[in-house]
Amino acid sequence: MTDIDIDTIINRSLHALENSEYSEFDLLLNQLSYLIKQSVNSNNKTASKEQITRILDYTPNNFNQVESLRLYRGLLILVRNFAPLLDIDLFPIVANSFEKFLKALNQTSEWTDRIIEVYWQILANFQRNEFTEVANEFFGQWESKYKWKDIPVSVMSPVIHFLFRQFNTQDPHITNENLLSLLKLFETNHVMNAVYEIFTMIDFADTNNIGHDNKMFIHLLYDIITHESFQKWIEQQNEEETITKWLSLTSVIVQTKTDWNNYELIALLSWNGSLFMKYAPLINSNCNTTVNGEDDFGYVEDDISAITAIFAELSQFNATKQYFEHYEDLLPKLIFVFKWIHDNIEPITIKSSKIEEVGRYSSVKTNIITILSYLSYDSFQFQEKIRELGGLSLVLSNCIIDNNNPFIKEQAIVCLKYLLQKNPKNQQFVADLEAKKVVDDQVLSEVGYQVEVIDGKVAVKRK
């Protein structure tokens, strides 16, 4: 394929488009098809930067003219195949060309949809570059015209490939500068909004059938929520809805990976811990209403629920226990939330509940007890702290069935076992409560203890 062949065919095709002259349409389409096949071979030369720019400068003006759309699509496919080898300075020109096409588009058809697909493929094929703000502006234009949930799979695939190529972490030992630049866009971050919207379209209930593109996208989410700048980004959000969305996303994503490294864990724990310390004191305000009778702090419940779910999932890692050791204010706040929910929200029992009834702060107590279980396991230090902060009595009080907190009884019994293990003070604390008939003997039996009276004193002993 010679330069003359490329230039001649591009010139003829553009001339036909600009003059709406399609008498040689079949010939031009065949010639473009030949070029497209040849362009797949990386050993062949690409079109010149000037010719690529000429193609991208053109915008169809008649969306009823099928010949025009097919011919222009052929030129764009040529650009798509050349994209990996093109000067990255052409990236903003592609984005601008795509924007012009979207603005001019006044009706859709099979061929306009195919052109849109090719445009996304061009963007996806470009080398990684630093035009983050250009990409963000383009995503804003896209959102003004389309809803992500309505995008066909054929378009979603190159969108995901584009996001992954531009923002994934290539080397965990080197700062991801592209993602850093993206996370510096605190306001009107259209790319981050798109990432969240795409996340909502993945069916996590059927993990065995998550396709390659979605798996790649999930790995990008790992990079985003563990990036060193994500904490600052999420803390700078003015809309509580955005924070709630990303907490919800993270509560799902942390369940899809079991090999978090310490750097990733510290990043996750840091921004979740920071948000928890912000929202925990507001739990009392969650009962307040505005003058219109609307809940002014409704987000607090959603956020605390998500954060405790994230902590519960990450508690299995030693780094989480170390994090709680280092940030000493976190455990008291956790037990404060535990106590507030225990005191203010009635358990839902089989007798009291309606079918499928769900109360407020659903599963939060179970999540907190799970966290306390991991912290107290083989740790005298945490056993003591939890008792001193009132956590042991709360765990004892929740060895019950509560439909608002599935499996809370089972989790509380496990936690109680860890709290009593090799801890005489905790055992005596429980014995004193048992003497007052506060503790169910059956619960003690289930954790392997029994009550004895020795020299007139009640004690708890291993069975």
UniProtKB/Swiss-Prot annotation:
InterPro entries assigned to the protein according to its UniProt record, in alphabetical order: ARM-like (IPR011989), ARM-type_fold (IPR016024), Ataxin-10/CTR86_families (IPR051374), Ataxin-10_domain (IPR019156)
Coiled-coil segments: none
Subcellular location: Cytoplasm
First and last residue of the signal peptide: none
Keywords: Cell cycle, Cell division, Cytoplasm
Membrane spanning residue stretches: none
BP GO annotations: cell division
Classification via Pfam families: Atx10homo_assoc
A GO CC annotation given for this chain: cytosol
The keyword Transferase appears for this protein: no
SUPFAM superfamilies, alphabetized: ARM repeat
Keyword Nucleotide-binding among UniProt keywords: no
Primary localization class, coarse: cytoplasm
Similarity field: Belongs to the ataxin-10 family.
PANTHER family: ATAXIN-10
Record's function text: May play a role in the regulation of cytokinesis.
Protein name stated in the entry: Ataxin-10 homolog
Naturally occurring in which organism (per UniProt): Candida albicans (strain SC5314 / ATCC MYA-2876)
